[in-house]
Each structure stands twice: as C-alpha cells, then as structure tokens.
C-alpha cells in the first residue's frame, strides 16, 4: 500500500524529560565532554526542548562543531566587563562561566558583562533560569555583542 503524491504522513511522538536528558547526556559523552560537563549540557538541551525552544534541533546543528573539541577552560583573570567566547559553544563554556559570575554576586549586588563572539547565547538561558529561583535575575540585550546583567534582588 503506497501513498499518493499529495499525501503526507504525520507522526506525533512524545518523549519524557528523562529520555531526552539521558540520550542527550550520552551524545555529549560521545562528543568528548567530560563527566559533569555532559550532565550540564544535557540539562541545557533538555530544558530548551521541554520549553519548546528546540533544544534537540539546536544540538543537531552544533554536533559537527562540538565533536571532540571540548575545552571549557576559563581564565578568571580575563573576566572583567567583557568576556570573549572565542566562538566556542556556550554548551562548553556556559556552565563554568555562569557559576563564576554567580559567585561574583556574593561580593556585589549587581554584575554587568558583555559576551563577545558568543554564537549560541540561547544555551545560557537554562543556566540563568536556575538562579532565578534564588532571587538572582538576569537580562540579555542583543546587539553586536550580548550584554548580560545579573542582579541579586
């Protein structure tokens, strides 16, 4: 039994959060992400997917770039009012960077930073959302650079 030229088959499949998370984690592990970093990246991808922001699609567009290129080293002495991602994915650098910036909030009520050469800032949103529950808010302003303001309320 075949399809006519104008017929389309639509299949709707749903997955649980756990299925998306574990499969994403396996993918990141296979891409060379270290233990812990693979969990952070899987959380980011799954959060975006669950919120309807196409986390899996975004991941599939980045796979070639991420394959065996994991490098999440951040030099804290180079983090001032601007941070250069050097076109590395926020999936790699984002978790450590956001944790560091949140630690700066302990010493100040407000911290402003511009992200330079960040080609995938959408991956920072789930990381910042986690801290919203702790009365730490953030704001993104997109222009040539990504400006972020992180504030402790």
Predicted features and spans:
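Long alpha-helical, hydrophobic tracts
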Residues: 8-87, 91
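A glycine-rich, acidic short-motif signal
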Residues: 56-153
